[in-house]
Amino acid sequence: MELNKNYLTQEGFKQLEKELENLIQVKRPEIIRLLQEARDQGDLSENADYDAAKAQQGEIETRIAEIQDILANAKLISDHQAKTKVTKVSLGSTVEIYDYSSKSNEKYTIVGTLEANPEEHKISNESPLALAIYGRLIGDECDVVGIEVPYRVKILKISNR
């Protein structure tokens, strides 16, 4: 697993494509219109509407460039990988673990950093938990380190998303 790659699921890739399309097709023209309206008001040196629209334009253009870079350098978690019987924890795996410290079962999907969302139990492949369980098998126990309070987990189940 190359840690510095932009790992994306097909779903995450499509979401970024959709966001990019919206920024280019909807947001960019909207800002251009707002800038023109602000210019039509006259003196730009003290025009708050123009300043706000110009700042918004900068944010949109920055996000467009960022998404284009992410998509150009993305490494997709392949459909083949998602359909293969999983024996080891890997990128795209959904893993059920037992956390000895909280005495509870938890389920996480390992995704690239850009798709990580703790509320949806999607953890980054660079997170301490993912690094601890990556490449492990069902039944393996391991310590999650690199955090303030290390803890121990046991892998109960590995499946594909």
From Swiss-Prot:
PROSITE patterns associated with the record: GREAB_1, GREAB_2
Coiled-coil stretches noted in the UniProt entry, renumbered to this chain: 8-28
One BP term from GO: DNA-templated transcription elongation
Assigned keywords, A-Z: Coiled coil, DNA-binding, Transcription, Transcription regulation
Annotated source species: Mycoplasma genitalium (strain ATCC 33530 / DSM 19775 / NCTC 10195 / G37) (Mycoplasmoides genitalium)
Domain of life of the native organism: Bacteria
Gene (name only): greA
NCBIfam families in alphabetical order: greA, PRK00226.1-4
Reported function: Necessary for efficient RNA polymerase transcription elongation past template-encoded arresting sites. The arresting sites in DNA have the property of trapping a certain fraction of elongating RNA polymerases that pass through, resulting in locked ternary complexes. Cleavage of the nascent transcript by cleavage factors such as GreA or GreB allows the resumption of elongation from the new 3'terminus. GreA releases sequences of 2 to 3 nucleotides.
Name of the protein in its database record: Transcription elongation factor GreA
InterPro entries for the chain: GreA/GreB_C_sf (IPR036953), TF_GreA/GreB_CS (IPR018151), Tscrpt_elong_fac_GreA (IPR006359), Tscrpt_elong_fac_GreA/B (IPR028624), Tscrpt_elong_fac_GreA/B_C (IPR001437), Tscrpt_elong_fac_GreA/B_fam (IPR023459), Tscrpt_elong_fac_GreA/B_N (IPR022691), Tscrpt_elong_fac_GreA/B_N_sf (IPR036805)
Keyword Membrane: no
Cited HAMAP family: GreA_GreB (MF_00105)
Gene3D superfamilies linked to this entry: Transcription elongation factor, GreA/GreB, C-terminal domain, Transcription elongation factor, GreA/GreB, N-terminal domain
Entry's family note: Belongs to the GreA/GreB family.
